Structures are given as structure tokens and as C-alpha cells.
Swiss-Prot record:
Native source organism of the sequence: Methanosarcina acetivorans (strain ATCC 35395 / DSM 2834 / JCM 12185 / C2A)
Enzyme class: transferase
Subcellular location, record wording: Cell membrane
EC numbers on record: 2.5.1.42
Matching PANTHER family: CHLOROPHYLL SYNTHASE, CHLOROPHYLL SYNTHASE, CHLOROPLASTIC
UniProt pathway annotation: Membrane lipid metabolism; glycerophospholipid metabolism
Name of the molecule in the record: Digeranylgeranylglyceryl phosphate synthase
Amino acid sequence: MSAGIRTYLELMRYGNCLMAGFAAVIGTLIAFNILTSGPLSSNFTGPFPFLDAGFVFLVVFLVSGAGNAINDYFDIKIDSINRPERPIPSGRVQAKEALYFSYLLFAAGTLLAFSINSICGLIALFNSLLLILYAKTLKGTPLLGNLSIGYLTGSVFLFGASVFGLEGLKTLFVLFLLAALAITAREIVKDIEDMEGDRLEDADTLPLRIGAKKAGYLAVLIGLLAVLLSPLPCVMSILGLRYLYLVLLADLGFLAAIVQLLVKNNPTKSSKMFKIAMFFALIAFIAGV
């Protein structure tokens, strides 16, 4: 390959990959705490699986980087106008090189995931295929693109928990669902925020298809569903009362985001409030064991 390592790291958006990798390890840590000392503690009594957690980090880093690289491959025309400094439109990486590089990362990440266990491998394989489909088709498909991002982001935590097999998967499934709902709602709000730019680029997003008002109602519905379901981890004895107290802060943030969207018609502020609320939700997940 003609480009240097730094250029390929830029193509991967390595900063985002690092954050995704750490988020997956947090999923492993939360599942470990729940399975060993939480209200639903199981027969698992082993030490924290540091090696598998390291593999989890690498898998998510590689697969996330592959998704970003192949996304740039399919966005060559748009990036040549909006982001000409990116590796492909700037000519520092050839388009075919970026495509082959992404396939290499997908393969390496998936194989490494199967070395952890079959559940991790299947999740990595499915997510890799979904990332390819998203970059090629779903990104420009109203709602399906938003749902894909919601699932993919939330599944990072689920993947980390899958180190412990099916038991780990079941343990964090509700948390994954809550995260996916919140992220999907925010993605729709971001599309409302970006309507003017998307219209100029002739993009096909949900707000442009059905209107900002209807898209806003859908985002609110999904966000409210996340709020209504947020006590479930405590009700199901997955997490303790500390989670319930802390998640109330997140719920207040989500409600504030809804007010900003519906009452004040400020999608930019709403998107920021969603982001803050999700941060408090993550703290609640970690501290609630």
C-alpha cells in the first residue's frame, strides 16, 4: 500500500475507534460485575478476563475502523466537496486501497472475535456485514440508517458482555436496548438539525422525507420509550438502586431534550441534551452494580 500508517489511521478515524474499543471493555466490566457481585450474580467466580478484554478492544477497534474506511470509500463524491482533506479525496489513499484495507480490517477483527468465543464471532461478523450494507445502501435510507446506527453503537456494550457467552449476552441485553433506543432518537434529531445541508446535498433523510415535525414526533416517541423502560434493569434485579437513582438524571436529560425539540424547536440544543443524558446513563450503568 502506498500510503503511510498515519494516513490509514486517519482513514480509520482512530480516535473514534479508541472510544468504541474502551466502551466495549466497559461492557465487559459491567457484565463481570453483575455476574460476580450484582443482584443476579451467577456461578461465575473466575478473575476478570484481561486477555479477552484486550481482544474485545482490538476487535471493536478494527471493525469500527473498517466501517469508517469503507464509509469513506462510498462517500468519495460527497467528501471531495465537503471534506477534500480526507485521505481518499486528497489522493493520499487510492479508493481501491481503502476498500481492500477495510476488508482486511473486517476479516482480522472477525477472526479475532471468533477466537474469544462463537457468540463474539457471530456478533462481529453480523456487524461487519451491516457496516458494509450501511455504507453502501442504508446510510441513504430514511429511518433504517438511523436504526442501524442505534443498533451498531449499542451493540458495542453487548459485544463486550459476550465475553461471558450467552449469560453475558442476556445480562446486558436490556442495557443494550436502552442505549440503542436513545441513540436512534438522537440520530433522528441530528438529521432534523442537518436538514438544510442535507437538502443542498440532495440527501434522503427521514425529516426530508416526512417533514421535521413528524420526524420530531418519532424521535420523541423513541426517546420516551427509552425513559419508560429505563427502570427495567432495577425491576429485573439486573442492577441495584444506585442505578435507579442515577438513571433519573439521565431521564431528566432526555425529557429536557424532548422539550428543546418539541416546545422550543431547537434540534441543535436537543441533540446536545441527548448526548449529555446518554453520558449520565452510562455512569448509571457502571455505578449501578
